Amino acid sequence: MRRSAATAVALALLSALFFTATYVLNRAMASAGGHWAWSAALRYLLTLPLLAVVMPWQGGFAPVWRALRAHPFVWLAWSGIGFTLFCICLTWAAAFAPAWLVAGTFQLTVIAGMLLAPLLYRDERARLPRRALALGGVIVVGVAIMQGNHFHGRLDADAWWALGAVTLAAFLYPLGNRAILLHLERSGEDLNATQRVFGMTLASQPFWWLVAAYAGHVAGTPAPMQVLLAAGVALAAGTIATILFFQATGMVRNDPAALGAVEAMQAAELLFSTALGTAFLGETAPRGFAAAGAVLVVIGIVGLGLLVGRDSAGNRRATRALRSDRGA
């Protein structure tokens, strides 16, 4: 069991590294003048065929087709919220803040998922856990310190818009994912995590073609480098990281400590985005109070991961909810 747990934690850490591509490559595309609409649309247009390649080994296509045909508008609506609107907000914000700041702010999604629970559930999951909320408060304080220090305590209009966009994305992502998961519970349709991600990616395609049409109208065709970087996000974050994380949680789903450690590896995204942004984009690493805020975010995520993992272990429904908030 120890070897399995160590392997799962290693896979989760590697998954966090690949998830970091979202922040770093989005920032690279924005810094190079790539239009945010192309960056967002290309990511999910390219994620679809990449996920299709691995689907035969992840439960197959047939269950997904049946689920989409049975309730097409449910999938369309929640995929538009949880994937399209989420990604538009996160990608647009990359033009106004370094990768580490976007990554750190997006960690608000862990408390967003808790705050949304009373709106989504009508059972014991609607309860707001006090200890988890306290740790979420640590994350919020850390994000506030990072934002305030980076912008020298004076957020201009663009900074406020960027902060609002990332915060909105942090709520839209768990809202869309958990709503689909709740729909599957009620309909009795059994899809694994990869099938759900593929289904939402497929269902969101009409929106992405509209976004691509808008991008083509206002910015022309994307540069080859932007297409390449968007493909990197699709491959790294949309495919590899997703599969690695699901594999890690599956290996230790009945081990509270190990599952918590796996979830806590999410905190490494902030560290990886700082290192990669500094090394490859020439960004300035957080210093002083900004660094202290980043440390608070990491502490909050690690603590929350350990707490949530302990409470979710052995509970199939809770573990599925935990896994549903990753993989975009």
Question: Which ranges hold each PLM region?
Answer:
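Glycine-/small-residue-enriched transmembrane alpha-helix faces in small-molecule transporters
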Residues: 1-42, 134-144, 152-185, 203-211, ...
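Cytoplasmic-side transmembrane-helix entry/capping segments in multi-pass membrane proteins
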Residues: 8-13, 68-78, 126-140, 190-199, ...
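Helix-helix packing/entry segments at the starts of transmembrane helices
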Residues: 16, 42, 102-108, 184-203, ...
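Specific transmembrane alpha-helical segments of multi-pass solute transporters/efflux pumps
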Residues: 18-21, 59-106, 145, 236-253
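Hydrophobic/aromatic residues within transmembrane alpha-helices
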Residues: 29, 39, 43, 93-94, ...
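Transmembrane alpha-helices of multi-pass small-molecule transport proteins
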Residues: 32-85, 112-116, 168-179, 196-216, ...
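Hydrophobic transmembrane alpha-helices of multi-pass small-molecule transport proteins
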Residues: 51, 118, 128-150, 287-308
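C-terminal transmembrane-helix exit sites in multi-pass transporters
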Residues: 109-134, 252-253, 258-261, 268-291
